[in-house]
Amino acid sequence: MKKEKKVTGYDKYINWKVFIFPVLALAVLLLIPTPNGMRDVGTQYQVGPKAVVNHLTRELFEVDSVDAAQWQLLTARIMETNMQMGALKKGRYLARDLKWCKKNKIDADSKNFELAFDFIKNEVDEDRFLSVMNSALDLRKQGLKYEELKGKDKAAADKGAWHIQVAIAVGAFVVLCFLTECIPLPAVAFCIGLLYVFTGVLSREAVAMLYWSDACWFIMGSLMFAAAFVKTGVDKRVCLAMFKKLAVPNTKWITLIFFIIIAPLAAFISDHALAAMFLPIGMLLYQNSLTDEVPEDKELAKLLMITIAMACNIGGPGAPSGGARNVIMMTYLTDMFGIDIGYFQWVTYCFPFVLVMIPITWFITNLRFRPKIISLAPAMDQLRTEIDKMGSWNRQQIWALVIFVIMVFGWFTEKSFYQMGIYPIRLGIGVIAVAGAIAYIITGVVNWRDYQEKVDWGVVWLYAGAIIFGRTLDSTGAAYWLARSVIDFLSQFGMESGLPLLMVSNGLTSVLTNLMADGPAAASVGPIALNMAGMVHPGTTYLPFMAMATAVASSFAYCLIIGTPPNAIVYASGYLEPKDYLRVGIPMFFVANVVLLLFTGIYWSFRG
């Protein structure tokens, strides 16, 4: 009898009875009058950069930006970009080079860069530099008033406010579509790009570039190499090596091993890579656990997939290398308040949080998913039998493993080697992942049919849409406006200091990180929360606690597929629905925030 094809979200048609609600939310948010707060933030983002550059050339060279020499203008632009990153100190400026300028889209040649570098190094002392940067920051945040703008500047501010309004409206549309599944999710990814083009927020060229960002290439390459592992049987050998020593290979022990291995590694290794490495192992465990008596156990499949994603998510805060969010908050703290947190010091404060979250997350995950199949001993026995039939490693398996090892080495070293000058160009982990996928074809490990049938291309497009959505929330200032509005509102109720401020900052960051990348989420909330903390708790340990807590909270992307790459990668297994993330994500969201508050109030306060 022919096995009936499994019905997934991709097989469903649009549900107009439900889809009308996201559409109405989008329309209402686009048509309401633009709030004044959006105009203020639009002024900061659209008029601010030009005004700041002009202010810097006046302060440093006593000329307007239009009359400044090329190297003087370059000096001001580098300082303005540094200011946006929260890097206010002279040392941060002197650490920049031509590669950094190119990455940040600042036109620079070696001659003008050397003139700018020498001027700052020799003519501007540390105190003078910091004073000028702080005055520029004050100008952008408080000195520019929408009501005082005229002509082109006012039109630019209005345009910026419209972009923020569109980003917020699209955000409501996307979240409702994801929660209700009223339209196939990859279609939502295309709706995001189309809405931004139709409303003038992004050009078609910008949208096309974002659809093929490095993160999207990484998702694609990861799913391709997972397909190669499954085809060759390497996943079976790795899986058996991991779990063969277990005396009682049941679901609870195996999921605990996943957490114990993945979560600590995620503090030092890319969570993208870990999710991609363990996905085929989780899928294999499920497929080999099925029997004639239990031909399908959806809860077991969901348990294994969610375990991999959650283990990746909780490990990131453990060390500065665990994510961009950690480095961003360290930079803000150093440049805004002169407080340095070293790598080891960060680990001693934040890695214990990871260790505490491992048993908590393991317990919640096993509580929310109750599989019929408890013992995976038959799966391990079947694995041994299949590997015995395979015999020794064949050519395809050796190539699959060798290419994978080279690819992982590239992921770990490409950034450092580029900075050291070993690699002449910055490759990015996405390019390396796709290069590995092509290497599998060149060596005859797979053919294109394998990729066509075994890679979930819908997930690739889904995450591409998520990249556009998150980047636009950040670049338009929509995330900053949302963060500022919430914190300003709650400050009216006495929540502008102490643990209440910490609770608001953590909660807001953890909401934003489910909608956008962790780095931009921390970058949006961090400066506002740190400034408020600096006013009410100057010179205290509260400031580094706020920085670390914001970074940790930005890892709480438990609730949506688009929240983090591991969530998207395990979704490609085909076993999960969007609501499955909420089953674990909602309790995890609240528990993680409570644990973080307790950590701050007890362990961090005790450490001082």
Where are the language model's segments positioned?
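Interfacial loop-to-helix junctions that mark the boundaries of transmembrane helices
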Residues: 8-15, 44-45, 153-163, 178-180, ...
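Hydrophobic alpha-helical transmembrane segments of multi-pass integral membrane proteins
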Residues: 246-282, 492-536
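Juxtamembrane and boundary regions of transmembrane helices in multi-pass small-molecule transporters
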Residues: 2-66, 88, 92-96, 100-135, ...
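Structural signature of hydrophobic alpha-helical transmembrane segments
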Residues: 158-168, 187, 213-224, 272-275, ...
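Transmembrane alpha-helix interface/packing and boundary motifs in multi-pass membrane proteins
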Residues: 174-183, 261-271, 309-320, 412-413, ...
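Flexible hinge motifs at transmembrane-helix junctions and intramembrane kinks/re-entrant loops
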Residues: 35-36, 172-190, 207, 272, ...
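Membrane-interface junctions of multi-pass transporters
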Residues: 184, 200-218, 226-240, 244, ...
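Core transmembrane alpha-helical segments of multi-pass membrane transporters/permeases
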Residues: 64, 68-87, 92-95, 99-136, ...
